[in-house]
Structure formats: C-alpha cells, structure tokens
Amino acid sequence: IFMYFILRIFKWSFIILFSLIFLILGNYFSKVFAGYYRLNVEQVYASDHFNFLKSHFEIVKPELGQKFPTVIMFHACGGPYPYLDSWQKFFSDNGIASIQVDSAGPRGMTRRTAIRTVCSGVDLQGQERAGDVYSILTNLNQYSWIDKENIFLAGWSHGAYTLMDFMTMNDNLIPSNILDFDQQFIPKIKGKITFYPHCGILNLSQKYPWRTKTPSIVFLADQDGFGLATQPTDCIDLFDSMNKEEKYIDYYLMENSTHVFDSEIYIRRGIVYNKESTDFAKNKIISFIKSSGSKDN
C-alpha cells in the first residue's frame, strides 16, 4: 500500500510538472508567434514613430565639415551599451557622423526588461523593429548635415537581425508596426554593417529575398555562445545561399571571439573583449564606407 501511494504521488507530480512546463512553453511561443503575425503590435504612422524615437537619439558629428557620411546604428537586444559610444567616437574621428538609435528607452524598457523580453524573442521582434529603421530613414531630411549619397546602416546582434528583416521589406511584406509603409520613400542605402546577427528561424531572410542587393559587411564570432540565437553557422549557410547568384555580402568569422567581442567594457560572463578582432573590423569598416556602393537601391 505504501509503495502504491508513493507511485501515485510520483505519477501526479509528474503530470502536474509536465502540465506546467507545457503551459509555460505554450505561453512563450504564443507571444513569439503573436508578434511574428502582427497580433500584439501597436501600429503607427512613420512620422509619428520618428518623433517618438528621436528624443533618445545619440548624434555624434565630426567637428569640421558641413555634410558627412552617416551611419545609423541599432543596438543589441539589451538596449544601448557604452561600447556603441566608442564606435561613435571612432566614426567621428574618421570624418563620419552617426546616429545611435535607442529602440528600448522610448518604449519604457529598462535593461532588465529588454533582456527578459526582447532577448527571449517575446517582444520587439525584427519585423517590428524594422519599423524603427523605416521611420528614421524616411525622415532624415530633417538633418541637413547628412550626406544623402552616403547613408549606411549598422546593427549589433538583435540590431543586425533587425536590419536583415528590414532588407526583406517591400509593399507586400511591411514592418509590423507601420501603417503607411511605402518602399519608394526609402532613401538610397550605400551599405550595411552588421555584427553577430541572429540568422535563425525568426529571421525573415530565411524565407524572403532582400529588396535590394545592398553591399553588406558582416562580422561573426567563432565562439559565439548566446544560446542558439546567434550561431555563426546559421549566418554562414544563409549568406552563402544569398551570394550564389551575385556576391554582395562579405562576412568574416573572427577567431577566438565571443558575442560582443568589440566591447571593452564588461557586459556579462562569457563575453570577452578581443582587440585584434575589433581593430580588424574597424579597418574593414572604414575601407567599406570609403569604397562601397549600392547597386540597385
């Protein structure tokens, strides 16, 4: 009788535990796919969304000059980190202006909230954040100092994945949060710079071609261990497939490099600054900005 009682307890404990796990996973995936299919996203006009975002812009320009090549920068899933400020200084020192876009702050997301919801894929997926990209690009005429022939996009991790999603957008596949998307209003993008993106199942580039074959440079990390989200092999397979007919994506697999290898400032365990890889990326980026040209955007 005693053993029977113990087995009954074990059986029902297992059923309850399994049910809880099922409910938790069901809740998670329902939120992920609700975002994917635009079921839980507030939709706005691009000009209103630009005004919503711009109060959190970090703009850095060179001291001398009137018009500058400009890099529009999109941070990783946890929000802006100081290493992006270092990149802005680097750009400025090389005669390049930059706008660092904060996608978390205007939405009221703290660092902890962003890590919990955005990094997990529950909130602000790439096709929604692509609306941030569109809203900014279509309102750059407010800045007279931008050289409109030399606009570049740059993204880190979630920001890189966002830019890849944005490149798939057209009048039939629009950002999930924009009411008035029109691809003819997207200005010429001279090039795209991305670091350690998510190239897996939620990345729209897995299913849809890019709107234009905009020249792109990508830096991957061979020791990237940010879960399954940023496996470099996913990106290598995807980029090789995209480059089959015409090569327009150059990627580099950085040796002895972790996720966010370009941050001198400590972020978390498992992320290590690699100066050699960062310097390599800097040299490639400057060369890319000076020589790149979009073929059909």
Annotate each PLM feature.
Residues 2-21:
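N-terminal Sec-pathway targeting helices
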Residues 24-66:
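N-terminal cap/lid segment of alpha/beta-hydrolase-fold proteins
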Residues 48-58, 66-146, 263-267:
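Serine-hydrolase catalytic machinery in alpha/beta-hydrolase-like enzymes
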Residues 76-80, 104-108, 157-160, 197-202, ...:
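Solvent-exposed loop/turn segments at secondary-structure junctions
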Residues 100, 155, 218-220:
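Hydrophobic residues in well-ordered beta-strands that form the structural core
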Residues 128-211:
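Primarily recognizes the serine-hydrolase "nucleophile elbow" in alpha/beta-hydrolase
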Residues 178-245, 250:
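The feature captures the conserved acid-bearing segment of alpha/beta-hydrolase catalytic domains
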Residues 246-297:
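C-terminal catalytic histidine-bearing segment of alpha/beta-hydrolase fold enzymes
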